[in-house]
Swiss-Prot record:
Positions contributing to substrate binding: H19, K23, T45, G46, T47, T48, S65, G66, H98
SUPFAM superfamilies: Methylglyoxal synthase-like (SSF52335)
Lineage: Bacteria, Pseudomonadati, Pseudomonadota, Gammaproteobacteria, Enterobacterales
Family that this chain belongs to: Belongs to the methylglyoxal synthase family.
Listed GO CC annotations: cytosol
Residues at the active site: D71 (proton donor/acceptor)
Keywords of the record: Lyase
Protein name as catalogued: Methylglyoxal synthase
GO biological process, one term: methylglyoxal biosynthetic process
Function: Catalyzes the formation of methylglyoxal from dihydroxyacetone phosphate.
Reactions mediated catalytically: dihydroxyacetone phosphate = methylglyoxal + phosphate
Length: 152
């Protein structure tokens, strides 16, 4: 696989996702970091996004609920370069019916090389990193070259 680069801008597009048992933890984290998050564009799966918006007043672009396709919608945005980082508080102790969607979402975040926090400690490290407020170059798959190679 060949790679190219893209710039994650200073004003980031952040996906916020949480499993049911983790929603309160994500709400608490968003509340703690509300001031910093106001400078960025927020996206979320349906229930999580509506909870964040109603509890914090922050504007959130909400997708469908995760089990109804929201995880896949966020994954599509990642593939299109429209999400710069993801905070995904997932519950490793409880299986969810849409587990394949969850795995696909995490796979796409890895393929497209975006920062991902899956717990509060990592989310704190991300938001407090000097890079959080700066434009950052990341390596991403060179899809055009990939497509050309596949069509040979």
């Amino acid at each position: 696989m060949e790679f190219t680069t893209r710039t994650i801008p200073a004003q980031k597009h952040i996906a916020l996702v949480a499993h049911d048992h983790c929603k309160q933890s994500l709400l608490d984290w968003v509340g703690t970091n509300k001031q910093q998050l106001t400078e960025h564009t927020l996206y979320a799966t349906g229930t999580t996004g509506n909870l964040i918006q109603s509890n914090t007043g922050l504007p959130v672009k909400s997708m469908l609920s995760g089990p109804m396709g929201g995880d896949q919608q966020v994954g599509a945005l990642i593939s299109e370069g429209k999400i710069d980082l993801m905070i995904f508080f997932w519950d490793p102790l409880n299986a969810v019916p849409h587990d394949p969607d969850v795995k696909a979402l995490l796979r796409l975040a890895t393929v497209w090389n975006i920062p991902v926090a899956t717990n509060r400690a990592t989310a704190d490290f991300l938001i407090n990193s000097a890079l959080f407020k700066e434009p950052v170059q990341i390596a991403i798959p060179d899809y055009q070259r990939y497509l050309q190679d596949r069509l040979k």
